[in-house]
Swiss-Prot record:
Protein's organism: Photorhabdus laumondii subsp. laumondii (strain DSM 15139 / CIP 105565 / TT01)
Protein localization: Cytoplasm
Protein name in UniProt: Exoribonuclease 2
MF GO annotations: exoribonuclease II activity; RNA binding
Function field: Involved in mRNA degradation. Hydrolyzes single-stranded polyribonucleotides processively in the 3' to 5' direction.
Length: 647
């Protein structure tokens, strides 16, 4: 009787048009239900039956219904799926050839039915790691989710799984590129000055093989120091547009992961033909500049193509020990002693000048994983930045400033690192926060390089980093740009790196531009697309380093879970759900859930905005506080470390 009834169809249409519909992001929970977050302001409850049609992270439109005075979201249309390509673990039941894959994500617990493509012939076992692509979604008319396995990664118990899974997840290479037939040294009509008689030295870690910078210094009659920075020249072997150049462009950077690296260039180039090894004649690009007695750079900046020969491979710790008068190491000759002594003087001059005229980053330790041949973590050692590290840092910053100036003045373009300081849209919040802390600041001034530097120096004088940490939330991210621009974070009006061409494609580009200036030839400006590719690769490499690190930290700290072992930790972030802390001894990041801070939720307030935890109206914790914690739990499946404060 109601079939094809026009009145009923009209009523349905009216109800449909009157129903509120919103677009938002699905947020899953571990309990089966979820929420639809709309513009970060409003969230709607998604009951378990409706959650079976969507996945955490899906962007959807949903109809909003009211049930017992509660607004409920019913997802209707998929706008953008959370999962496209993903990695996960194969699930397989005994005596059943069907396969499922569980995505490797903390909030995706359900196994997805899957099958391999015809090209994937590996006989999958339960627990194997694989990469897959989503093919079916319930909101796209399918009965359920379904994925297609596009590749095998490794078996379940492979101790190198953290590396192989992470590299596959981010679509990054696992191996060094191979040498190509067209990779031959070809300078064309470029003339090289022979500087092999000068006592250039390299200073690196003991295990470094890809040495790309060497230093030489001489004292002048007027008291200035003539600093020469020699940088390895892979562009002598790699022509622009060649096969190897395209590979380097794609990789963009050497990928440094805990335990090993995946180079941008073939190892025979990066660790042999181009590496500035001791007593080996190598092509190099040299920057020469005077360091005046007050630390200022002279106006005699010069770049030229050269042959150099490093006279010694020095090691950071040994040079630092000698300068700090500890240990037993001695330089091999008086000439090397002179070089080290003068380089220390150069470093002191430049550091003092930067303190007064630019900005200096606070020293933060590096953490190095010591692994055995099977990928087990034997130890994690803290490597502090020492005197020799600062020598190399000052020399590299000096040479990058010189390159930035020459590229700007001679060409007007190059690959520049640009950082614009505070986000203009948030500058009023910065001013308000500073005024609350008795710092008088003006909006217009804070958006200038000088005003930013003045504020940073004032914050550096504070007894704690609490205000500094809160202010950093309002800063922009550093960008890679094809034109000059200021770098507020360093305190310079322009900054362009060129000192690591073996490891960074951006530095290879700047090498070619500097060579064009030396040879007085025309050259094209780098494209915005190239800069975007460099930035994206840098982001992926950093995520890969973090992911592998998280996995290894979880392995390393698992034996301490549930024990009374104490760790000193710094509070690095405060969210509504609790604290994130960094363990001082090894650099691991752990999470302290809010209930571990105080049992009565109504008496507890965790505020990211103020950077504080308030218990019963009193500030109990704040950013950068140092506290003692113990490891409560290590969740290996999500690589999460859960800690709690010691009583």
């Amino acid at each position: 009787m109601f079939q094809n009834n026009p009145l009923l169809a009209q009523l349905k249409q009216q109800l449909h048009s009157q129903t509120l519909r919103v677009e938002g992001l699905v947020k899953g929970t571990e309990k089966g239900f979820g929420f639809l977050e709309v513009d970060g302001q409003k969230s709607y409850f998604i009951p378990p039956p409706h959650m079976k049609k969507v996945m955490h992270g899906d962007r959807v439109t949903a109809a909003i219904h009211t049930d017992k005075e509660r607004e409920i979201a019913e997802p209707e249309t998929l706008i953008e799926p959370f999962l496209n390509r993903f990695v996960g673990r194969i699930q397989k039941k005994e005596n059943d050839n069907r396969l499922w894959i569980t995505p490797d994500h903390p909030l995706l617990k359900d196994a997805i039915p899957c099958r391999p493509t015809n090209q994937v012939t590996h006989p999958f076992q339960h627990g194997d790691w694989a990469v897959a692509e989503m093919r079916h979604h319930p909101l796209k008319g399918s009965r359920g989710f379904h994925a297609e396995i596009t590749g095998y990664i490794t078996e379940s118990d492979n101790h190198y799984a953290p590396w192989w899974v992470t590299l596959t997840r981010h679509n990054l290479e696992r191996d060094a590129p191979a040498m190509t037939a067209d990779c031959q040294m070809n300078d064309g009509d470029l003339e090289r000055i022979d500087l092999t008689s000068l006592d250039f030295v390299t200073i690196d870690s003991a295990t470094t093989e890809d040495m790309d910078d060497a230093l030489h210094i001489a004292k002048q009659d007027d008291g200035s120091l003539k600093l020469s920075i020699a940088i390895a020249d892979p562009t002598a072997y790699i022509a622009a547009g060649s096969e190897l150049d395209q590979i380097a462009h794609q990789r963009a950077f050497t990928n440094y992961l805990p335990g090993f690296n995946i180079p941008m260039l073939p190892r025979d180039l990066s660790e042999n033909l181009c590496s500035l090894r001791p007593n080996a004649r190598r092509p190099a690009l040299v920057c020469q500049v005077s360091i005046l007695e007050d630390g200022q750079l002279g106006d005699d900046i010069a770049f030229f193509s050269t042959w150099v020969e490093s006279k010694a491979k020095l090691v950071y710790d040994e040079v630092s020990d000698w300068l700090e008068k500890t240990g037993t190491w001695e330089p091999a000759s008086e000439a090397i002693k002179t070089q080290i002594t003068l380089l220390k003087e150069m470093s002191d001059r430049r550091n003092q000048w930067r303190h007064q005229n630019a900005l200096i980053f606070k020293d933060r330790p590096d953490y190095r994983f010591i692994l055995d041949e099977n990928g087990y973590v034997l130890d994690i050692v803290v490597e502090q930045r020492r005197t020799a590290n600062r020598i190399v840092e000052e020399a590299m910053i000096t040479s990058n400033l010189c390159a930035a100036k020459i590229l700007r003045d001679k060409l007007g373009f190059g690959i520049y690192n640009v950082h614009m300081g505070f986000e203009p849209l948030q500058i009023e919040q910065v001013v308000e926060l500073l005024q609350e802390n008795d710092i008088d600041a003006k909006t217009e001034e804070l958006l200038t390089l000088d005003g930013f530097c003045k504020l940073r120096r004032e914050l550096d004088k504070k007894p704690t980093q609490f205000l500094d940490s809160r202010i950093r939330r309002f800063q922009t991210f550093a960008e890679i740009k094809p034109e000059p621009g200021p770098h507020f974070g360093l305190g310079f009006d322009a900054y362009a790196t060129w000192t690591s061409p073996i490891r960074k494609y951006s530095d290879m580009i700047n090498h070619r531009l500097l060579k064009a200036i030396i040879q007085k030839t025309d050259v094209e400006q780098p494209s915005e697309e190239t800069c975007l590719q460099l930035a994206e690769r840098r982001r992926l490499n950093r995520m890969a380093e973090r992911d592998v690190g998280d996995w290894l930290y979880a392995r390393f700290l698992q034996p301490h879970a549930g024990t009374e072992q104490r760790f000193t930790a710094e509070i690095i972030d405060i969210t509504r759900g609790g604290l994130r802390v960094r363990l001082a001894d090894n650099g691991a990041v752990a999470f302290i859930p809010a209930p571990f801070l105080h049992a009565v939720r109504d008496e507890l307030q965790c505020s990211q905005e103020t950077g504080t935890v308030i218990i019963k109206g009193e500030v109990a914790y704040q950013l950068n506080d140092i506290i003692d914690v113990r490891i409560d739990e290590v969740r290996m499946e999500t690589r999460n470390i859960v800690a709690r404060p010691t009583a």
